[in-house]
């Protein structure tokens, strides 16, 4: 039996060499490692040392922030929940929200700082309060990594000393892009948090691309003198999302230029091709034998699109459906497929269903109905 796949923008026909960077690659990127990905595609569109684990500066905190955002998304943490800052959390160095030991502050305020500036004190405070202890929080972060297929072991919740590959960052970024709470703050350039005593701390997102690159909605940046400038970015245009990770750029400007070059390449090279929409009629008035109606519309149950190289040519369609169909037919049982081809080669198939049930009017069914009627009336 044909296996049908109907996923929005997750099946891709890419008619160009993709994978490892080398001489003659169509983009020039100044960084130690990088990759360009499309969520749902296992292999990167382009990469240089994309699977090689490296130090990623502040992005080592991304698994913790993602775990927290998922907890907010699921309702485990409410934004209005008051949380107390421990001496340990208040002692965290690096980018911070300037929290003070013993201070009480709402979880929603802490989340802003965790996402926008990777504030270590806010991350630890959220983790300690929401999960009961840092060790339990760390266990939950490890679960997040395992679910995403990232085999890394963290020694603390902030990821001290951990190495991630560019592809790891894109995988984490793809998960973060699905989080409502993460995206809410990752796309904000400037905000502030209000402490319990009325004191305010201004937050400025270091990701300049959310203001300078059309469609960029995040995700996170980081830098350290010895590790360079790192970032994972996501851009959405025309319902297509690309992600890029850059590790070890020499400057902030190089980091953003690298990501911009990768996105420019993607939008210049690929185009989405819409195939079907959920509930859309793919074949009107398809003939039916022995039914209580002579025809039925055939519809797709899912959205389906391809992402093609702009030079790929025209996508053609044929219907792989018995003509005519024979009743009975059921709206939840597939009767065939719409098959899409490129250059004569099948590239995608979408399952088709009757738009409505069609009862059978065959002689056998007629005799059965007569028999049932006879029994109901007592002969």
Predicted segments with their positions:
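Intrinsically disordered, low-complexity Ser/Thr/Pro-rich tracts
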Residues: 1, 16-23
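Sec-dependent signal peptide recognition
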Residues: 2-10
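Hydrophobic alpha-helical segments, especially transmembrane helices
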Residues: 3-4, 62, 237
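Residues in and immediately flanking transmembrane alpha helices
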Residues: 15-16, 74, 274-277
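Active-site-adjacent loops and short helices of periplasmic peptidoglycan-processing enzymes
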Residues: 20-180
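Hydrophobic core
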Residues: 9-17
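Generic structural signal for hydrophobic residues
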Residues: 9, 140-141, 205, 262
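Domain-terminus/edge residues, biased toward the C-terminal soluble/receptor-binding domains
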Residues: 147-151, 161-379
């Amino acid at each position: 039996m044909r296996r049908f796949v109907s996923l929005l923008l997750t099946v891709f026909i890419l008619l160009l060499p993709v994978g490892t960077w080398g001489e003659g690659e169509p983009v020039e990127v100044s960084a130690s490692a990088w990759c360009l990905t499309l969520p749902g595609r296992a292999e990167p569109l382009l990469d240089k040392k994309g699977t090689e684990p490296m130090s990623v500066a502040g992005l080592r905190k991304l698994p913790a922030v993602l775990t927290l955002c998922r907890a907010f998304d699921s309702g485990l943490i409410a934004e209005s929940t008051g949380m107390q800052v421990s001496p340990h959390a208040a002692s965290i160095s690096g980018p911070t929200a300037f929290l003070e030991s013993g201070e009480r502050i709402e979880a929603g305020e802490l989340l802003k700082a965790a996402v926008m500036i990777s504030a270590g004190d806010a991350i630890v405070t959220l983790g300690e309060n929401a999960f009961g202890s840092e060790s339990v929080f760390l266990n939950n972060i490890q679960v997040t990594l395992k679910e995403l297929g990232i085999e890394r072991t963290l020694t603390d919740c902030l990821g001290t000393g951990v190495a991630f590959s560019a592809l790891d960052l894109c995988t984490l970024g793809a998960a973060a892009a699905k989080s409502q709470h993460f995206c809410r703050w990752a796309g904000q350039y400037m905000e502030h948090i209000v402490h319990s005593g009325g004191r305010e701390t201004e937050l400025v997102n270091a990701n300049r691309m959310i203001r300078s690159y059309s469609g960029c909605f995040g995700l996170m940046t980081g830098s350290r003198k010895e590790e360079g400038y790192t970032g994972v970015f996501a851009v959405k245009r025309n319902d297509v999302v690309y992600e890029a990770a850059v590790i070890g750029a020499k400057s902030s400007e190089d980091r953003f230029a690298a990501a911009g070059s990768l996105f420019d390449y993607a939008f210049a090279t690929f185009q989405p091709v819409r195939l079907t929409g959920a509930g859309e009629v793919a074949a009107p008035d398809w003939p039916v034998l022995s039914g209580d109606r002579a025809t039925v519309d055939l519809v797709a149950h899912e959205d389906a699109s391809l992402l093609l190289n702009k030079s790929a040519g025209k996508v053609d369609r044929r219907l792989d459906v018995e003509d005519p169909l024979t009743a009975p037919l059921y709206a939840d049982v597939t009767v065939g497929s719409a098959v899409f081809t490129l250059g004569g080669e099948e590239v995608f198939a979408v399952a088709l269903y009757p738009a409505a049930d069609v009862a059978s009017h065959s002689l056998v069914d007629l005799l059965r109905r007569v028999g049932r009627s006879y029994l109901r009336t007592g002969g």
